[in-house]
A protein has these predicted regions:
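A short, acidic, amphipathic alpha-helical segment used as a generic capping/interface helix at domain edges
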Residues: 84-98
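Domain-level recognition of soluble alpha/beta enzyme cores
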Residues: 120-135
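Active-site signature of alpha/beta-hydrolase-fold catalytic machinery across serine-
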Residues: 22, 114, 118
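Short glycine/proline- and acidic residue-enriched helix-loop micro-motifs
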Residues: 60-80
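Generic beta-sheet signal
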Residues: 101-109
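Glycine-rich phosphate-binding loop signature in dinucleotide/nucleotide-binding domains
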Residues: 2-4, 95-101
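Short beta-strand scaffold positions
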Residues: 10-11, 86, 106-107
Length: 135
Protein backbone atom coordinates (compact mmCIF):
# COMPACT_ATOMS: atom_id res chain seq x y z
CA UNK A 1 0.00 0.00 0.00
CA UNK A 2 1.38 3.34 -1.02
CA UNK A 3 -0.94 5.25 1.32
CA UNK A 4 -2.29 4.13 4.67
CA UNK A 5 -5.49 6.15 5.05
CA UNK A 6 -6.48 6.77 8.67
CA UNK A 7 -10.10 7.75 8.03
CA UNK A 8 -12.53 8.48 5.19
CA UNK A 9 -15.15 11.21 5.33
CA UNK A 10 -17.87 10.61 2.78
CA UNK A 11 -20.83 12.61 1.55
CA UNK A 12 -23.99 10.69 2.51
CA UNK A 13 -25.36 10.64 -1.04
CA UNK A 14 -25.69 7.14 -2.44
CA UNK A 15 -23.31 7.78 -5.34
CA UNK A 16 -20.46 8.95 -3.09
CA UNK A 17 -20.98 6.14 -0.60
CA UNK A 18 -20.79 3.64 -3.47
CA UNK A 19 -17.63 5.33 -4.76
CA UNK A 20 -15.98 5.21 -1.33
CA UNK A 21 -16.92 1.56 -0.86
CA UNK A 22 -15.42 0.69 -4.26
CA UNK A 23 -12.22 2.65 -3.63
CA UNK A 24 -11.65 1.07 -0.24
CA UNK A 25 -12.98 -2.41 -0.96
CA UNK A 26 -10.93 -4.91 1.02
CA UNK A 27 -9.28 -2.16 3.06
CA UNK A 28 -9.79 -1.84 6.79
CA UNK A 29 -10.54 1.88 7.02
CA UNK A 30 -13.21 3.69 9.04
CA UNK A 31 -15.76 5.64 6.97
CA UNK A 32 -17.82 8.45 8.46
CA UNK A 33 -20.65 10.20 6.63
CA UNK A 34 -20.91 13.95 7.08
CA UNK A 35 -23.50 16.36 5.66
CA UNK A 36 -21.16 19.34 5.31
CA UNK A 37 -19.55 17.76 2.24
CA UNK A 38 -22.82 17.20 0.33
CA UNK A 39 -23.13 18.27 -3.30
CA UNK A 40 -23.85 21.90 -4.14
CA UNK A 41 -26.44 23.29 -4.51
CA UNK A 42 -28.70 21.72 -1.92
CA UNK A 43 -32.43 22.26 -2.39
CA UNK A 44 -32.49 22.25 -6.20
CA UNK A 45 -31.85 18.87 -7.83
CA UNK A 46 -33.48 15.90 -6.10
CA UNK A 47 -30.55 13.69 -7.08
CA UNK A 48 -28.57 15.76 -4.54
CA UNK A 49 -30.97 15.04 -1.67
CA UNK A 50 -29.77 12.32 0.65
CA UNK A 51 -31.82 9.51 2.10
CA UNK A 52 -32.87 9.64 5.75
CA UNK A 53 -30.25 8.49 8.24
CA UNK A 54 -32.25 5.41 9.27
CA UNK A 55 -32.45 4.20 5.66
CA UNK A 56 -28.73 4.85 5.08
CA UNK A 57 -27.80 2.87 8.20
CA UNK A 58 -29.79 -0.11 6.93
CA UNK A 59 -28.25 0.07 3.44
CA UNK A 60 -24.65 0.67 4.60
CA UNK A 61 -24.15 -0.84 8.07
CA UNK A 62 -20.35 -0.53 7.89
CA UNK A 63 -20.42 3.26 7.57
CA UNK A 64 -20.66 5.50 10.63
CA UNK A 65 -23.65 7.85 10.32
CA UNK A 66 -23.47 9.18 13.89
CA UNK A 67 -22.53 12.72 12.76
CA UNK A 68 -25.59 13.32 10.61
CA UNK A 69 -29.17 14.08 11.69
CA UNK A 70 -32.11 11.96 10.54
CA UNK A 71 -32.85 14.50 7.78
CA UNK A 72 -30.33 16.88 6.26
CA UNK A 73 -30.50 20.39 7.65
CA UNK A 74 -28.91 21.66 4.43
CA UNK A 75 -31.81 20.65 2.17
CA UNK A 76 -33.80 23.84 1.65
CA UNK A 77 -34.71 26.09 -1.24
CA UNK A 78 -31.79 26.91 -3.52
CA UNK A 79 -28.61 26.96 -1.45
CA UNK A 80 -26.39 29.92 -2.40
CA UNK A 81 -22.60 30.27 -2.64
CA UNK A 82 -22.38 31.97 0.75
CA UNK A 83 -24.04 28.92 2.32
CA UNK A 84 -21.64 26.62 0.45
CA UNK A 85 -18.68 28.62 1.81
CA UNK A 86 -20.11 28.26 5.32
CA UNK A 87 -20.41 24.48 4.91
CA UNK A 88 -16.86 24.33 3.61
CA UNK A 89 -15.54 26.37 6.53
CA UNK A 90 -17.48 24.28 9.03
CA UNK A 91 -15.93 21.11 7.58
CA UNK A 92 -12.45 22.64 7.62
CA UNK A 93 -12.89 23.61 11.28
CA UNK A 94 -14.13 20.10 12.02
CA UNK A 95 -11.04 18.56 10.38
CA UNK A 96 -8.79 20.66 12.61
CA UNK A 97 -10.29 18.88 15.63
CA UNK A 98 -9.38 15.44 14.30
CA UNK A 99 -6.24 13.57 15.28
CA UNK A 100 -5.98 11.57 12.07
CA UNK A 101 -3.30 12.74 9.64
CA UNK A 102 -4.09 10.84 6.45
CA UNK A 103 -7.67 11.73 5.65
CA UNK A 104 -9.56 10.91 2.48
CA UNK A 105 -12.58 12.99 1.48
CA UNK A 106 -15.07 11.42 -0.93
CA UNK A 107 -17.35 14.25 -1.98
CA UNK A 108 -18.46 16.18 -5.07
CA UNK A 109 -16.64 18.40 -7.54
CA UNK A 110 -18.27 21.72 -6.64
CA UNK A 111 -17.83 21.22 -2.91
CA UNK A 112 -14.23 20.05 -3.35
CA UNK A 113 -13.36 23.00 -5.60
CA UNK A 114 -14.64 25.40 -2.94
CA UNK A 115 -12.85 23.51 -0.19
CA UNK A 116 -9.53 23.07 -2.00
CA UNK A 117 -9.15 26.36 -3.81
CA UNK A 118 -10.90 28.83 -1.56
CA UNK A 119 -10.72 27.38 1.89
CA UNK A 120 -7.57 25.39 2.67
CA UNK A 121 -5.13 28.27 2.67
CA UNK A 122 -1.95 26.59 3.92
CA UNK A 123 0.40 25.41 1.18
CA UNK A 124 2.55 23.52 3.70
CA UNK A 125 -0.45 21.39 4.58
CA UNK A 126 -1.40 20.87 0.95
CA UNK A 127 -3.99 18.20 0.37
CA UNK A 128 -2.83 15.32 -1.77
CA UNK A 129 -5.11 13.74 -4.31
CA UNK A 130 -5.90 10.14 -3.52
CA UNK A 131 -5.96 7.84 -6.54
CA UNK A 132 -7.58 4.41 -6.09
CA UNK A 133 -4.84 2.52 -7.90
CA UNK A 134 -2.23 3.82 -5.44
CA UNK A 135 -4.05 2.62 -2.35
Amino acid sequence: EKYKIDIVFVSPLTRTIQTAKNIFQGKNVKMIAIDEILEYPQGVEHCNKRKNKNELQKLYPNIDFSLIPEKSSYWKDNENLYELKNRSKKFKDFLKTRQEKKICIVSHSTFLKEFLFNDVGNIEEELKHCYPYNL
